Amino acid sequence: MGRIENDNQDVSDDGSIIRVKLPNKRIREQFAQAELMLGSNHIRVRCSDGVTRLGRIKGKIKKRVWIREGDILIVVPWDFQDDKCDIIYRYTTPQVDWLRAHKYL
């Protein structure tokens, strides 16, 4: 039987399916890289538009996901202060490899 492909998933080299969340440009989400841990749930991030912002880890992912320097993230810049943003998602290593292979990063 043939294999059914889905638009939301891709098969990696070892045969496992990788699902990757992409930034939604309509709500100003963008890629960023964690540069410096500042403590108290704040991180300095370099966004894909070239701006360095102060990122705040949202309460939803505060205790569930550990963010380290160098991690690739999805952030949403604030409407009223462009030098600050909310961190809403962290990519795992296989997801980052997939993003690089498909030229998103």
UniProtKB/Swiss-Prot annotation:
SUPFAM superfamilies: Nucleic acid-binding proteins (SSF50249). Residues 18-92 form the S1-like domain. Keywords: Initiation factor, Protein biosynthesis. GO terms for molecular function: RNA binding; translation initiation factor activity. The keyword Protein biosynthesis applies. It comes from the Archaea. CDD domains: S1_IF1A. PANTHER family: EIF-1A (PTHR21668). Seems to be required for maximal rate of protein biosynthesis. Enhances ribosome dissociation into subunits and stabilizes the binding of the initiator Met-tRNA(I) to 40 S ribosomal subunits. Belongs to the eIF-1A family. This is Translation initiation factor 1A. It comes from Methanocorpusculum labreanum (strain ATCC 43576 / DSM 4855 / Z).
